[in-house]
Amino acid sequence: MTHGPLVVLHDHLDGGVRPATVLDLCRAAGVATPADDADSLAAWMTIQPGMPLDEAFSRFDLVNAALQTPDSLRRVASEAVEDLAADGVVHAELRFAPLLHTAGGMAAAEVIDAVTRGLDEAAVTTGLEARLIVCLMRDQPEAVSDAAVDAAIAARGRVVAIDVAGIEPGFPAERHAGPIARARAAGLHVTIHAGEMDGPHQIASALACQPDRIGHGWRIIDDCEVSDGRVTALGPIASQLRDAALPLEVCLTSNACLGRPVHGHPVRMLADAGFRVGLNPDDRSITTTSPRREFELARDLLGVTEVEMAAMSERAAVDAFLPDDERAALVARVRAGWDVTVPRLVHLAERERWQAAQASGVYLPAEFEADGFIHLSGLHQVLTPANRFYCGRSNLVAVVVDALLIDNALVWEPGTGTDEYFPHLYGALGTDAVLAEIPFPPQADGSFLLPPELIRAVRRR
């Protein structure tokens, strides 16, 4: 598979340790292992479909038992960056729970410092500067989460966010609402595991905590009506999630290990319905995957094209927990690294209105809600819901727009649904943001297909 640079937003440090390293560290720490060679240990570490949750989590318990010294943490952090960089990753956010590594006497601050040193060492040789996300464990008391947040706040800069992770059933994210709010007030981002092991009610609980991203989230499909492989209606939680345009950090192989085969994964249906999705490895060693393999699976089993993969990579860069200038540089690097061009946004307007607006050099649409809007940087284009806009209308022009030039849309960037309107998006759209203008009449029955020239449009005015 040939592809451009990848961005990883959901990767657990303890889930990606090389089996040979686990064996070395366990021997050094005097921790018993279920196998005496790396290959056999790798087979044992791999989570199998249908495995009970407690048995699956025992794999992490073994790894974490060996990660109780500064040197062990430094080593696995460095190796994680090496492995990700070798797979074509140019930005990574590694998450872990520092308080799970204090059994040997280290304080949480020492744990974070050891991991940071490992990241710094690998950055010198790979050029990949990874960031850290501190996990709160959802089954632990609020006081423990407060301690984790304290450590995260103290390490702001390299630590960019907090997460709520661990076993979902019986442990809603709202149990940690106080620590989450305190982290946000201190300037940290928030991502929350939800809808991975349990249903949409866990996503509702996560949304109540006002996250910036959702880990996994695929079980939101249980709050959708589906017919003929398409989402036909959204329930209240699904509507809230889509309307919020929150990124879903989808992990195909990891979900398959918990019983959802990749070929039956709803990620494409969710993208078609306007949800903001991306692909991530989750636990590279324990689920035997990599960022590259996640894209290969999406291509081979879900029919994702290279243009769509490039779009997901760009959007992951937009969703990264970085300062604005670093995010802009990352987006530019990712876009330049793919051999395909992704039309970011398409605005459909009456041709006369658009031509009149060009005379002034900017497009300031009145009554914007009368116009149609399509976002093309998802996995797939959403066709059916927009028919209400096209049916019976003629003399339309499709204006292919570069989202990165629209009213600081690099930071804001809307969701993916065609059935959405964003009157606040166009503060002032300069003609230099336009990539192409294409006549776009609907078909006689009101349905439409995106013409190839629209998909390939790259001409800048």
Please give the residue ranges for each predicted region:
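Conserved, structured core segments of small domains
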Residues: V342-R461
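Histidine-centered active-site/metal-ligand motif
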Residues: H10-H12, H193, H216, H265, ...
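Metal-cofactor-binding active-site regions of metalloenzymes
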Residues: M1-L188, M197-Q202, L207-R213, R219-T341
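Short, surface-exposed loop/turn motifs that are enriched in glycine and acidic residues
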Residues: I192, S227, A256, D371-H375
